[in-house]
Amino acid sequence: MRLFLLLVGLTTVIADDLPPTCIRPVYCNSTLLHYVQMARLYPDSKTFVDFQMRKDENATLSAFQELLDRTNHNPTKEDLQEFVVDFFDETSELEEWKPDDHKENPPFLAKIRDQGFREFAKALNDIWPTLARRVKPSVLEKPEQSSLVPMTHGFIVPGGRFKEIYYWDAYWIIEGLLITDMTETAKGMIENLIELLYKFGHIPNGSRWYYQERSQPPLLAAMIKLYYEKTKDIEFIRKYISALEKELEYWLDTHLIAFNKDDRVYTLLRYYIPSAGPRPESYYEDYELAQKLDKNTDPNDIYADLKSAAESGWDFSTRWFISESGDNSGNLTNLNTKNVIPVDLNAIFAGALQITANFQAILKNPRRAAHWGYMAEQWRSSIEQALWDEEDGVWHDYDILNNKPRRYFYTSNLAPLWMNAVEKPFLAKHGARVLEYLHESQALEYPGGVPVSLVNSGEQWDFPNAWPPEVSIVVTAIQNIGSEESSKLAKELAQVWVRACKSGFTEKKQMFEKYDALNAGKYGGGGEYTVQDGFGWSNGVVLEFLDRYGAVLTSVDSVDASANNGQSNEESETDSKEK
């Protein structure tokens, strides 16, 4: 009944009804923002919108209007730079923070047999304090003068330009924190996200006001599951079960769409963010892109598709391109995110439904457990029927504009296996076929990890980039097939990845946001900004693999690699360098 009522309410948003990107004009919807960003005062559009105001919003906007009046609405770049210096403070709103639960030698290190990998894991554990931040008291006193949304607990930032908490990054960061026994820090990060959920009605892309209107893949339930599996903290589940249900309701209320396939109607989720104007943190880039469109095209159409792609986390990729011929060729002007039904979003949501059902059962709420369990079963069924491709032997995104599956390799194709959104009989029947698909694609044969796609478009979420979260998804998906062959393959891919990351870390002393599948350990390229180091989810994924497979992975290939853990530090490091 609920799904029927939701379907009745599905309508197309009229441009005049579009909400602004956020309710803070200075940072989201003002002539001030437009003038400053289009003047290109800073090479990265995110720089300006991360500045704090020295005065309140009204005083800042009034002063800018006076500048426009004085200059006949034609201020010079120097005028704008002077205004920004006078009215904005580029000092960070965050301060460094040392988590009390950080341990120099967490117990999991003892599970890692290979000495080179054990030392690598320890080095990654040592990075956590360098990425730990908390909101400054001055920001808490005047939160309205910053684009940062204050949060109660300290947290781990991804790194580089990403100086705030990010929704889907947090999943792999929290996983890494739990592996290294930083349970209180992980708990605080989850509670920060729940604070954002209650403040906005959903968890935004990140803890900035300019992310207000969009979310990211709904991984809150999966994060809480990780925390519960580590701590068995049933009171935490009891306290926040309503938050899980609130998030599920948000996605059902705002992202649901009905579509036809083979004369049947299916109801699944898509990414769709209809709000006015460019993304503030990429204002210049979005505005310039809109100028390339046909003059009869409403720029808010492309802005919505840009924001929707950003909500997916895959900003940007041919995955969201629909050309005039209906394929995934073209460029950003071909973005059509709203007309793609994503495999991974629906797999994650099916997983969230089932996790919530399981938690309600643990809490002895059988009616709520049955409600969410039934929806999870229906979601898995829709994924199987609408997104499984019998010919290819894998799941594909679905193009609702042209009513056809998008038969291209993307790592997201494996998300149902990752999120256990596959019924056991179906898995038993088709698991081997998925492995065949992967081998036929040749996507597993690169020295630097599994690339996110096989299309070299120049976009950062395409070939040759290998992204840590997607490598995690692929390896875990293959492991979850449950066969001897799949288990062996998962370990092999994990070893390739950890070796590649270790190679890059040895050379550069840094972990990167993304890597080059063609060159083991080299950072990836493309996109709207320069390479970012740190890096939260990259550290988390390596720790995940070493925690899961540390007893068997080796950092070098040699006849006596099995005895590597018995070598001295000096001998082990010499071997690693020689290789």
Curated annotation (Swiss-Prot):
Gene3D superfamilies: 1.50.10.10
Bias type Polar residues, positions: 560-569
Keyword Ribosomal protein set for record: no
Tissues with expression: In midgut and Malpighian tubules.
Region (Disordered): 560-579
Annotated catalysed reactions: alpha,alpha-trehalose + H2O = alpha-D-glucose + beta-D-glucose
Signal sequence extent: 1-15
Any single GO CC term annotated in Swiss-Prot or TrEMBL for this entry: basolateral plasma membrane
Keyword check for NADP: no
UniProt main location, coarse: membrane
Catalytic site: 315, 513
Keywords from the named record: Cell membrane, Glycoprotein, Glycosidase, Hydrolase, Membrane, Signal
Record: residues binding substrate: 161, 168-169, 205, 214-216, 279-281, 313, 528
EC assignment: 3.2.1.28
PROSITE patterns to which the protein is assigned, alphabetical: TREHALASE_1 (PS00927), TREHALASE_2 (PS00928)
Glycosylated residues in this chain: 29, 58, 205, 331
Top-level division of the source organism's lineage: Eukaryota
GO biological process, one term: trehalose catabolic process
InterPro entries, per the entry: 6-hairpin_glycosidase_sf (IPR008928), 6hp_glycosidase-like_sf (IPR012341), Glyco_hydro_37 (IPR001661), Glyco_hydro_37_CS (IPR018232)
Family that this chain belongs to: Belongs to the glycosyl hydrolase 37 family.
Function per UniProt: Involved in uptake of hemolymph trehalose into epithelial cells in the midgut of feeding larvae.
Name of the protein in question: Trehalase
Species annotation: Bombyx mori (Silk moth)
